[in-house]
Amino acid sequence: QMCIRDRSVSGAGKAPMDELVTQSKDFLEGKKISSKNFTKQIAFNLIPHIDEFVDEGYTKEEWKMINETKKILDPNIQISATCVRVPVMVSHSESINVEFEKPFDIKSVKNILNKSSGCKVIDERKDGGYITPLEAENSYLTFVSRIRKDSSNNKAINMWVVSDTLLKGAALNTCLLYT
């Protein structure tokens, strides 16, 4: 249904990663910050814009995400996406809302996700009972946390998904799909 993808600076390459480090140092030292690889300052900031703007106010990155999801899962799936560049070095994360055809049991959803190859559920309902982008670094797993029923729709769930994009990017995911 809906996905907000938080993309780390590594998704843009090495120069943007270096820029995040430089901007962070400059910010903490009270220096003027310049942006070469981003449309705005990335250090201590979020940029709700990745790639160029195209149809209906979406960006190329958002359309790419929508089309890839349809290609992998189902061409008829209805999805909307917002992609945000975040001041995180490596891992991408997504806040996802999924609607099912009928009501479901949240425990069953967690069990199915936990049994999925390359997926690990870390979902404790307490402070720190979830995975963060930093904790997902250097792992080939995709972590799922904050799994809960959507309070506005009894056929939908919300969840938080994180993976190290340098290790588990599109190429590895494609290979896993074919195996």
Residues covered by each model-derived region:
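Conserved small/polar residues in nucleotide/adenosyl-binding loops
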Residues: 2-6, 178-179
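C-terminal substrate-binding/catalytic lobe of Rossmann-fold NAD(P)-dependent oxidoreductases
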Residues: 5-158
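Generic C-terminus detector
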Residues: 156-177
